[in-house]
Amino acid sequence: SQYQYNIPDHYDNGTFIDPGVLVDDDGRVYVYCGFLGSYMCELNGDNMYEVVDGSYQTDIIPVTETEDGFFEACSPRKVGDTYYLIYSPKIGSRLAYATSDSPTGPFTYRGYIVDNGADYPGGNNHGSICQINGQWYIFYHRMTNGSIMSRRGCVERIEILEDGTIPTVE
């Protein structure tokens, strides 16, 4: 692969914002990103900038016209043998997740973890899950002061059920 910067036709080839990185148990490194379309690739772990030939994929979370369709902000995690992608869907007040048996997908939409409601109709939500001392949490942000520029960090306990689902935080 050849690294290129500021490709003029970047919208035709994807908009690569809000990257999330997963280092798998075998040491392989995967990057997930996107805006109105999801992308992933494997990086050469020796230099961390070269894309492994043949690894680039588009629409790892299927593009849909529904409110759960991918918008931006991929955050990958591995829980047991299941790969999770937490992302901001088209309804920006929510954090959705999709799962797969492989870091390269295919990923299947599973539901919402957080819904901020009508905090700010033009805002979005970014965040991820993390296990601390055996307890799983979701870290995310909400709008405050009725402004997209005023965000406050939040954390909630979550539960990952045996079937891999994560009930929505109430």
Regions found by a protein language model. Give the residues of each.
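Carbohydrate-active catalytic/glycan-binding domains of CAZyme proteins
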Residues: 1-170
